[in-house]
């Protein structure tokens, strides 16, 4: 087992999954400091969702239990913002949280610089940071695989869900015969990357996302995906029934 280590935390409502990517923009001093530290130290950060129900520490949103170690790729400045791509790698579990050196404050539309804020705590806490950190344990790779029949069925159901949403909002007008070949070309045969991409696309509930991240086996992850798609199908049927009844 990999020994525990301390990492910066990037806390947002949804989080990310391993082997997936997400373009992000930061403007807060705490996350600018975090990115500077990660670039200088060539280290990763922990991208993690906020805990549900919400709790805080020093005014900052507390993280959930499970997250994903990420590297910051394609970092660039755009005015006062930093743009980058979070590239998910391995999963982790939070063991202990290290608070930020300063409490949360509302700065309005104009943020102070990182250096100005560091001056407020550097004497009392020379090793402090503006961002939350955590002692974590990295989780091992998923055990096993999803067998082809089960995975192929999930890709078909996923395609049908995409078509159902498209039909409901009257978007592209694409049918199953249009969407399924695209999905099969992208996600067949089974790969762990495809499994996590499905999680990123399908799972929008806090409990489902945490359950997937905490899984030990690939079969447990696809259990979560199958249940989520079934719930979404029932929701779509209910919405369609209400619309037809009006």
Place the predicted regions along the sequence by residue.
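N-terminal low-complexity, acidic/polar interaction/targeting segments
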Residues: 1-246
């Amino acid at each position: 087992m990999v020994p525990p280590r301390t990492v910066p935390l990037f806390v947002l409502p949804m989080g990310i999954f391993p082997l997936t990517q997400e373009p992000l923009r930061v403007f807060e001093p705490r996350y600018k400091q975090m990115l500077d530290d990660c670039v200088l130290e060539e280290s990763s950060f922990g991208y993690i969702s906020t805990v549900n129900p919400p709790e805080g520490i020093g005014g900052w949103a507390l993280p959930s239990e499970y997250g994903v170690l990420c590297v910051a790729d394609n970092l660039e400045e755009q005015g006062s913002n930093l743009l980058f791509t979070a590239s998910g790698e391995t999963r982790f579990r939070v063991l202990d949280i290290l608070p930020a050196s300063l409490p949360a404050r509302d700065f309005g539309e104009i943020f102070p610089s990182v250096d100005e804020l560091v001056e407020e705590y550097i004497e009392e806490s020379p090793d402090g940071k503006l961002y939350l950190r955590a002692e974590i344990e990295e989780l091992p790779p998923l055990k096993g695989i999803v067998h082809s029949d089960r995975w192929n069925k999930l890709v078909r159901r996923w395609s049908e869900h995409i078509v159902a949403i498209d039909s409901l909002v009257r978007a592209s007008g694409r049918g199953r015969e249009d969407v399924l070949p695209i999905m099969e070309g992208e996600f067949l045969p089974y790969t762990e990357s495809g499994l996590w991409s499905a999680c990123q696309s399908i799972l929008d509930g806090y409990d489902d996302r945490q359950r997937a991240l905490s899984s030990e086996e690939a079969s447990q992850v696809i259990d979560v995906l199958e249940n989520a798609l079934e719930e979404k199908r029932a929701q779509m049927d209910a919405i369609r029934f209400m619309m037809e009844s009006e």
